[in-house]
Amino acid sequence: MKGYVVCVYKDITNEEKLKEYAVKARIAVEKYKGKFLIRGGKATANEGESSPRTVVIEFPSYDEANLFYKSKEYQEAHEILKGHAIRPVSYTHLTLPTIQPV
């Protein structure tokens, strides 16, 4: 089952640090066979607060997403961004909806 890392930024205070982080984070994403599905772009909040940036990365499995996040490569990238962005990061697995007969 595929795994996903989801990051919805609440605030970005240093765009240069974000760019530096992105370069290093990409190395870890590629190492763990991740694929960016959403990275930035225009967004509209229909409910709740709007976000300046959203990122969704798909991995071959939940375990691979977990390994990516805990990897030395990603943690080095994460250190660059500390104090320069507020963002919850979570990882999840794909669950197919159960369709109930009518």
List each language-model region with its residue ranges:
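C-terminal structural segments of small proteins and small subunits
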Residues: 75-82
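Conserved small/polar residues in nucleotide/adenosyl-binding loops
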Residues: 92-98
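Short S/T/G/P-rich N-terminal loop/turn motif that feeds into the first structured element of a domain
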Residues: 1-53, 60-66, 70, 94
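Cationic, low-complexity basic patches in intrinsically disordered or flexible, solvent-exposed regions
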Residues: 101
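Short, mixed-charge low-complexity intrinsically disordered segments
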Residues: 86-88
